[in-house]
Amino acid sequence: MPTIKPKNITALISAYSRSDLNELDETLNSLWGQNLAAESVLLITDGPTPNKLNQVISYHQLHHPKLTTIQLEENQGIDPALQQGLAEINNEFFARINSDDITLPHRVEHQIIFLQNHSDIAAAGTAVIESDDHIYQKTKNLNLATTKIRSLPEKDDDTVRYCRINSPLNHPSMMARTAIIRQSGGYRQLHFMEDYGLWAQLISIGARLHNLPEPLTYFRTLTAQIQRRTGVGILKPKWQIQQNLISYGITSKPQAIFNLIVRTFYRTIPRPTLKK
C-alpha cells in the first residue's frame, strides 16, 4: 500500500458575509481534529466579511498556521470563489467542505487511502449524514439532529448512469486529484449547479468517479438553504446543466427534457407547500 502523505492534501472552504461564525468555527475545529490532517486549509472569503467572522478566522490562523485565507474584494458567488481557490492549490489532492459542515475525524484518512490505492479514480465522494440544524442548535447533539444518511451509487459505471438524472457525488464530501479537476475546467458558473456541472465535465473527459459508502461528513440542512434552491428561479440553471449533459454525450435531448420536468417539479413547489 502506498505511504499516506497528508502533505499532499489541501482542504478547500468558501465563506461569505452571511456565513455563520459559530458554524465556521465548528467546521475548522473538525478539520484540526482529523486523525490524518491535511497539510493546509485554504479558506476563500467571498467578498467583505463582518468583523466577528473575521475574528473567528484570525483566531484559527493564530493557532493553526496551516490555515491560509484569500480575500476576494467583491462577492462573486461560490463558483468563482472555488475556482479562485482551485487555482491557488499546490497539493496533489484537495478536499471540499462547506463552511457549515462537520467532518468526522477519519474522513481525510479514509479518502486519501482510497485514492492512493485507486490511481484511476479522479474524485471520491462519500455518503453524508444530513442533520437538522434547528435541532442541533437546541441540543448540540449531532446524533439527535440526524435526519437521514444520503448515499449515492458507489462504482464509476453507476455514477455515470446516475449523472444522467442527478448529481452523482455529494460535493461537500469530495476529495479529488487537483490536476484532473483543473483539466476538466474546474468550477464554472452554474447557479446552485456547480458541483453537478463539475462531475459532468469530469465524465466528459473520461475521468472516473467513486463514492465511499461510509458517511464521513455531517451536512446541515437549513430552511433558508432549501428556499434558495426552490421556486421558478431554479429552472434556468436546471436547463443549463441538462444542455451540458447533452453536449457531453451523457444524456439525450428527450431524456434531458424528461429530467427537467421530473427533477424540477419538486424544486418549483413553494416552500410553504412542501412543509405541509
Which functions belong to the PLM regions below?
Residues 94:
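Short aromatic/hydrophobic "clamp" motif used to bind/position activated sugar donors
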Residues 45-55, 98:
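A conserved acidic beta->alpha catalytic loop
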Residues 98-102, 127:
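The conserved acidic donor/metal-binding loop of glycosyltransferases
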Residues 18-33:
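Short, well-formed alpha-helical segments that are part of the catalytic scaffolds
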Residues 6-10, 32-43, 65-68:
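Short loop->beta transition adjacent to catalytic acidic/histidine clusters or analogous donor-positioning motifs
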Residues 106-144:
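Conserved donor NDP-sugar-binding/catalytic core segment of glycosyltransferases
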Residues 11-14, 151-233:
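Conserved nucleotide-sugar donor-binding catalytic segment
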